[in-house]
């Protein structure tokens, strides 16, 4: 079962069916069931392991909502040997690859046609446990904070009952790939056209109506694109919101994609890296938000712990490096493949 951004009721029903029929569940952070006990952490990394997936490829995938975050998920849905069924209560549904062979308004039309295969399900769980250990070992290797580790550690450090707003591009994908799902944290993300506009405004608005502490994790370009969202009207309430910004001075996601290849190194920085050259701490302070920089896991924990009792808005900036993050992504992929080698 693959669950993307979409109606929470359909997502909950899908997760219940996954439990009932021992179906592996891969749910994106904004799906509404990311924290479900059956959701496989790092499911996208698991699907990205070619050899392991070849031995455990499903015959059928049930899709709920609009999954957009992962190339391995998209590749699975595009596989001609996999039957793709979509659940949608609306007359329009997400099917970018045009691969769905059946669309039903609810899971009543998607009952299993074969006995429950508990052993196959347990094989997915064992593989997920191996992957989790492998990625944690890689993330804990460098002494400082990377953007990848930041995504995992921010989610882990949030107090129960928190709201977490995720920016598009790398942060939401890092949380999807690397963070341990939390059932006691509400996760929101603007997945519409997957753009970065308006994320600060979204976080401020959501924080103002949330009964509890609120946090946002967004990249530096996302932060800069909605900078005036930090402006609060005179007499308006201030949100209890902490915005955490991994700042790699530009569009770091492209360093992990095809434009980041060595043959494009001459033009990469100007065309794709798009450096802004701004210190985001004084930028945030100029708009009235307390802001400070952290560089170690302990400083991050202290910053998030301190935010719980302060109330009001604040910005936490973590400097990262685009090229180093790309290298780390390759190390994570290699570690996952090694962990799954020979696993039945």
PLM region spans:
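Terminal amphipathic helices with adjacent charged low-complexity linkers/tails
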Residues: 84-122
């Amino acid at each position: 079962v693959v669950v993307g951004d979409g109606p929470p009721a359909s997502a909950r029903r899908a997760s219940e069916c996954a439990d009932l029929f021992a179906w592996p569940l891969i749910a994106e952070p904004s799906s509404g069931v990311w924290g479900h006990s059956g959701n496989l952490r790092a499911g996208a990394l698991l699907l990205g392991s070619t050899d392991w997936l070849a031995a455990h490829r499903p015959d059928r995938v049930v899709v709920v909502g609009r999954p957009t975050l992962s190339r391995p998920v998209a590749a699975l849905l595009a596989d001609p040997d996999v039957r793709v069924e979509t659940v949608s209560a609306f007359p329009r549904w997400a099917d970018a690859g045009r691969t769905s062979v059946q669309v039903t308004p609810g899971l009543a039309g998607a009952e299993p046609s074969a006995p429950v295969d508990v052993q196959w399900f347990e094989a997915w769980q064992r593989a997920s446990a191996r992957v989790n250990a492998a990625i944690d070992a890689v993330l804990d290797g460098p002494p400082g904070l990377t953007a990848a580790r930041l995504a995992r550690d921010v989610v882990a450090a949030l107090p129960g009952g928190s709201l977490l707003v995720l920016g598009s591009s790398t942060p939401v994908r890092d949380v999807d790939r690397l963070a341990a799902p939390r059932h006691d944290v509400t996760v929101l993300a603007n997945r519409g056209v997957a753009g970065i506009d308006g994320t600060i405004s979204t976080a401020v608005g959501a924080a103002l109506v949330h009964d509890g502490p609120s946090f946002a994790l967004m990249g530096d370009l996302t932060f800069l694109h909605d900078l005036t969202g930090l402006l609060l009207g005179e007499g308006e309430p201030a949100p209890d919101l902490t915005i955490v910004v991994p700042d790699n001075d530009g569009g770091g996601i492209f360093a992990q994609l095809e434009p980041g290849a060595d043959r494009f190194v001459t033009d990469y920085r100007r065309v794709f890296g798009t450096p802004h050259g701004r210190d985001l701490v004084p930028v945030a302070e100029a708009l009235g938000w307390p802001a400070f920089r952290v560089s170690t896991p302990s400083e991050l924990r202290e910053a998030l712990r301190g935010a719980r009792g302060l109330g009001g808005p604040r910005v936490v900036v973590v400097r990262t490096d685009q090229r180093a993050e790309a290298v780390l992504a390759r190390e994570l992929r290699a570690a996952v493949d090694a962990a799954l080698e020979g696993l039945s």
